[in-house]
Amino acid sequence: EDVSCTTQSVNDPSLYSIDEASVEVFESREFRTEIFSDSGISLGPLGLADDRSVLNGELVTTNLVITNEGNVPLQFTVNVQNSWPTQLIEGANEVVNGDMSVNILAGNSLSISVNTIVPLAANKGDSNTMIIRTTLQDSETLINGTRLIIEELASLDTESSGQIEVALGKSSITQ
């Protein structure tokens, strides 16, 4: 790109100079990735992140956000290494236990949902580390991950239109 710059005196318009330069903009292929829980909480780096408690049969969603910080469109391949079944979803595109290719325009971001089904036969304390690899076409790979661990989560569901009054240490049955 050729650029021309004219500088003129404010006191004497007959004094001026014209400078020309050729400017070349280099291609930038910078990008970043981040993963979030289904409630929008950033999970951070795998080595520092807390384990995510899950239950048998639960569908766990992890959202991968890829941001193209460069100045050219970029093509990526996303894959998940996981011993439990996974599904990648981006818009109308869906891939089960495979790789997904996506294109992202310069300055834009794209979100991919990674669904994992926790096996019904898994035992309390079993864990699975899900590794998400985002590879820029013919270039670098960024790796994100999260660890899912099966835990017993105590919960209490009540259905009553009023209050339930129970003395400390006693039990009560409501119908």
Q: Language-model segments: which ranges?
A:
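Long, low-complexity ectodomains and other extracytoplasmic segments of secretory-pathway proteins
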Residues: S9-V72, G125-S127, T134-Q175
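Short glycine/proline/serine/threonine-rich loop/turn segments at secondary-structure transition edges
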Residues: E1-V3, L120-T129
